[in-house]
Amino acid sequence: MEQYEKVEKIGEGTYGVVYKARDRVTDETIALKKIRLEQEDEGVPSTAIREISLLKEMQHRNIVRLQDVVHSEKRLYLVFEYLDLDLKKHMDSSPEFVKDPRQVKMFLYQILCGIAYCHSHRVLHRDLKPQNLLIDRRTNSLKLADFGLARAFGIPVRTFTHEVVTLWYRAPEILLGSRHYSTPVDVWSVGCLFAEMVNRRPLFPGDSEIDELFKIFRILGTPNEETWPGVTALPDFKSTFPKWPPKDLATMVPNLDAAGLNLLSSMLSLDPSKRITARIAVEHEYFKDIKFVP
């Protein structure tokens, strides 16, 4: 650890404290994530090993880079590139952001590129939210951070833990108790982020699982076997749910053009099997005017 000098604590991560720090060798500013090991008799928690193994494989311009792993008997530190701005802070502090549809488009494109890359490596993110989308102020490039809850998924998709995605960005199949979800859960979250960037407020700000579901159904309509085959068999589906008709998405996201609305509605399909994939979404006509040099 002699190589790294802590500068200040910048937050509490899923598994421990995050510090801003300096690399004494290169003089580079880095983010140091300290993983708590005290409760673990076996040493390094499997959650951290999973995060490390995933992140070491993840080499992409839109993924936060894991630079080093420092391990001692009682401590585990992950060394990441340092970015001090996240999408939540950026939206809160930049009133001009909402007036710049190109900026929204550029950010959305980069989120989708990062997610498409993850999915191509059989990795779900599962915890997408504005706080873990980091922005490089100099280049305006956006990177996905915090793979704390991600895990590699094989085919067939295994049963996953229930608590993964922050409520406002949580896909309806998870809210309805599905144990066999896959990559569409991330695409749903990206759709929620897209609408939030355009509207400057969350689309489905539920304060409980049922409130979240009902906020979704009030806008997109209550699903049934016709619109989502198999939905009534999900563990938490109730035949007593109010039967709301779908609203026109254009009234909910009025500042979005036709191509944007088409993309958004294909990301917010209630039936996960009908949801667009990240790989196909990056080719959508909404992005046709983007000249993005990799």
UniProtKB/Swiss-Prot annotation:
Residues 4-287 form the Protein kinase domain. The active site is at D127 (proton acceptor). The keyword Hydrolase does not apply. InterPro entries: CDK, Kinase-like_dom_sf, Prot_kinase_dom, Protein_kinase_ATP_BS, Ser/Thr_kinase_AS. ATP binds at I10, G11, E12, G13, T14, Y15, G16, V17, V18, K33. One of its GO terms (molecular function) is protein serine kinase activity. Phosphorylation at Thr-14 or Tyr-15 inactivates the enzyme, while phosphorylation at Thr-161 activates it. GO terms for cellular component: cyclin-dependent protein kinase holoenzyme complex; cytoplasm; nucleus. It is an enzyme of class 2 (transferase). Its EC number is 2.7.11.22, 2.7.11.23. It catalyses: L-seryl-[protein] + ATP = O-phospho-L-seryl-[protein] + ADP + H(+); L-threonyl-[protein] + ATP = O-phospho-L-threonyl-[protein] + ADP + H(+); [DNA-directed RNA polymerase] + ATP = phospho-[DNA-directed RNA polymerase] + ADP + H(+). GO terms for biological process: cell division; G1/S transition of mitotic cell cycle; regulation of G2/M transition of mitotic cell cycle; regulation of meiotic cell cycle; signal transduction. Pfam families: Pkinase. Belongs to the protein kinase superfamily. CMGC Ser/Thr protein kinase family. CDC2/CDKX subfamily. This is Cell division control protein 2 homolog.
